[in-house]
Amino acid sequence: MTNLEVDYAIIGAGPTGLYGAYYAGFRGWSTAVIDALPEVGGQITAMYPEKDIFDVAGFPAVRGRVLVEQLKEQADQFSPNYVLGEQASELTAPEGGPVTLTTAQGSTITAKALLITGGIGSFRPRPLPAGSDWEDKGLAFFVPKPDHYANKEVVIVGGGDSALDWAHMLHPIAKRISIVHRRDQFRAHAAMVTQAREMGIDLLTPYEVTALRGEEHLAEVEITSKTDGAVTLLPAQEVIAALGFIANIGPIADWGLDLDKRHIRVNTSMQTNLPGVFAAGDIAVYEGKVPLISIAFGEAALAVNNAAPIINPELGVFPGHSSGESN
């Protein structure tokens, strides 16, 4: 159980939260970063540590875990207080402050301002209906260790970015990669689909996985055509279900924030309807929002700098350039 008083508190230790911690530290503020997960990195650490990310400025490609390591190193210059493995459960944000957070584990964090970077909230993968008895016997929902798939026949189920990203990542080491999608059109970026075809990855559409078969471990996947009902058997030792996630923002829904479904509405300063409370990253929504990690970094900087007059009325929003002095 932890009791902290800081200038700036951040919910979420994913990339957006870590960059927010860096920027708050750059402005000379004490910070606390709270996350329900036991490690920093958010969804990237939990689900995609070996996935390459292509839309971070300055990096043609960067492995997820490497990006998280560098963001943490950047933030740690200013010694943020990490409160990990604890879920923020209650918030009070009176006019004039301070903001007080209480975690489900009994910790209390008091801050002059708060940034919520909770991503999509808590999440669990959408199940593969035909695979309910096959977890740990060949069915997986994430790819934390690509080498596990070396020299194996792999079926990836889904048509989004994750399905194509994993196919591209595993293609050099797997014996064979097949993607099964229940629609003719993929949701993934068209260039990734084209590249998959050119690489020789089998794209099987419109098909649905109707059964997994094997003895102690998966041996084959039954797929059924949605066009004519024809059944095909694919030899496979591994199946990766990339069907998206069921998300829940949890206690945040009860804090009196102006919500749009699972997202928090913010203004152009990234401020919410509650005094001293800001939001950035996937959880924040505004007109024209584009949910990209590169944009989330800018949102975090906006949120931090617009909190400056709350932290100290003598401070301006603009911090000065990073090549000069902070504050």
Model-derived segments and spans:
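N-terminal Rossmann-like FAD-binding beta1-loop-alpha1 element of flavoenzymes
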Residues: 6-33, 166-171
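Glycine-rich FAD pyrophosphate-binding loop
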Residues: 11, 25-47, 176-188
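Residue-level detector of alpha-helix initiation sites
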Residues: 14-16, 39, 122, 161-162, ...
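Rossmann-like NAD(P)H-binding beta-loop-alpha module
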Residues: 38, 150-173
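Conserved N-terminal glycine-rich FAD pyrophosphate-binding loop of Rossmann-like flavoproteins
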Residues: 38-62, 189-197
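A Rossmann-like FAD-binding core segment of flavoenzymes
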Residues: 72-103, 108-111, 171-268, 311, ...
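FAD-site-proximal beta/loop scaffold in flavoenzymes
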Residues: 127, 132-150, 235-294, 302-309
